[in-house]
Amino acid sequence: MKQFIYADNAATTKLNKEAFNAMIPWLTDEYGNASQPYAFARKPKKALAESRKIIAKCINALPEEIYFTSGGTESDNWAIKGSASSDPDKRATITSAIEHHALLNACASIERHGYPVTYLSPDSEGTVDPEQLSAVITDRTRLVSIMFSNNEIGTIEPIAELARIAHSHGAIFHTDAVQAIAHTPIDVKAMGIDMLSASAHKFNGPKGVGFLYIRKGVELRPLNDGGAQEFGMRAGTENVASIVGMAKALEISCSALNENAEHILKLENALLERLKESGLDFVRNGARNHIPGNISVSFKDADGGQFFIVWT
């Protein structure tokens, strides 16, 4: 039997074995509620603190700027809705037309509540032009949200320049980095990122857990009501096992980021060579500056059966 090759790692990734093993104690013996004041909660509470440090280090943030969530969708919704409701004098949001539906639908939601949203159109390679942002942003803009890398074609956006323009008008800058984190270097301080969304299952962590980086000083309202978890900003008992697994997976990926990128680019080039040799008429989509391994191609006048030629 031939080895199975999963070719949709932009949709999800396999759970890292080390991350899985790191989760086990928190699912078995150390199952205490980290929010409680007694001794049995101390180890889970410490595990959350250590996980925050690990994640923060990967993106050059402070541990107290990391807020655990259920994943990228919640993080995006929190960034959009929490920002829209926090300052009535700055109501406008600017985003792009190629964002993930988690963010686009969150924007549609605030539009229904009277908050204006402007959608920027990228160029043919999926790049959002900073000059286009400069042309539409005003001092009434509260938030600019542009994804770090597109999940369909892999294009990496000019994040630092877009953030600079946002800040020049007093706006905060959010990026959905779900597809980018652990695959390309991210420095939230150097890039001027105020908020960043991430999801563990995109970097070999468990599903159902993620985080939102919120720069110290950014005003954001809680998305849900309940207990005082996550510094009083995100109610709900913390999923300690998954958070620990996420931190371990991110630590492993970030420590080998350059090595992994080099390996994946070799595989990417090998696949493209194979496609050229197949005789299929195709074009590569996206920009030269893209996430390693994210390959988008369009085929001319080809039916599904022809694609098997590539692998035989």
Regions found by a protein language model. Give the residues of each.
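Pyridoxal 5′-phosphate
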Residues: 1-312
